[in-house]
Amino acid sequence: AYNLAIPEIVMYNPLIKTIAPAGAASEPRDPITEAQQRWIRETPHTAQRAAMLLLYSGLRRSEATALTWADIDLDDATITVSKGYDFRAKKVKIPKTPAGVRVVSIPKVLVDYLRTQQDGCLYVLHNPKGRQMTEQGWKRLWESYMRDLNVKYGYDGQQNKNRPGGLPMLIDTFTPHQLRHTFCTLMYFAGVDVMTARDQMGHKDISVTLGIYTALDKKFKKKKINRLDTYLKKSCANSG
């Protein structure tokens, strides 16, 4: 597997606040910020394993739900994706397109984390009984996760998340799908070519990947030109 270097980068704030149910309208695809990535890495929670997996592999939530430890080769730093969980039918299904079946290379930060997480259960992500996560299970898990992050980073740990009436959200929350999109964005900044990114993400049509890369190109075009100016300035100075 190739070495997937994932840098920490500052990205624009997410807008979405909750998990969209399966089959609902598409969620906004804003990547999460560098600070939010750090929250995921540094905050122990039952949902941390799911968040780390989605953020640093780009798997779909359905793919992550169906994932078993046998699908992960930590020595080779790869995940074999061959199935997904249908939340409506409540059963595992094969991907809708050949592109969905793939081997995903994962960065060292995820490999090292997963080495500490093997717990003897069949599924990588599971409920307290060791079974696959349901839609409701995901919803409860993620709501709890956002509440904990809100207490720690919004209130500096000075409030009780179970306070009667609840706590207003002071942080920008994010969804599992945003973590998948963030992984694609990280690949862009790491210089991963669009064909490799398409394979990693399991996009049926490369135009989807190209659309993401093109949008990022437009957003950061000025910064690239500034780097060119800096390079040319140094080059001209050295030749003079």
Residue map of PLM features:
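Conserved tyrosine-mediated DNA breakage-rejoining catalytic core shared by Y-recombinases
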Residues: 20, 30, 34, 67-116
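C-terminal secondary-structure termini that scaffold catalytic or DNA-interacting sites
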Residues: 76, 89-91, 95-101, 105-110, ...
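Short, polar N-cap/turn motifs at the start of nucleic acid-interacting alpha helices
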Residues: 71-78, 173, 192-214
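Proline-centered turn/helix-capping motifs that create local helix->coil transitions or kinks
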Residues: 5-14, 73-77, 114-116, 121, ...
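Short, charged hinge/linker segments at domain and secondary-structure junctions
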Residues: 2-27, 82, 156-167, 226
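Catalytic-site neighborhood detector that most strongly recognizes the C-terminal catalytic loop/helix
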Residues: 23-24, 31, 85, 111, ...
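Basic, Lys/Arg- and aromatic-enriched nucleic-acid-binding interface segment
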Residues: 10-67, 75
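Short, basic (Lys/Arg/His-rich) helix/loop patches that form interaction surfaces
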Residues: 39-47, 57, 104, 119-123, ...
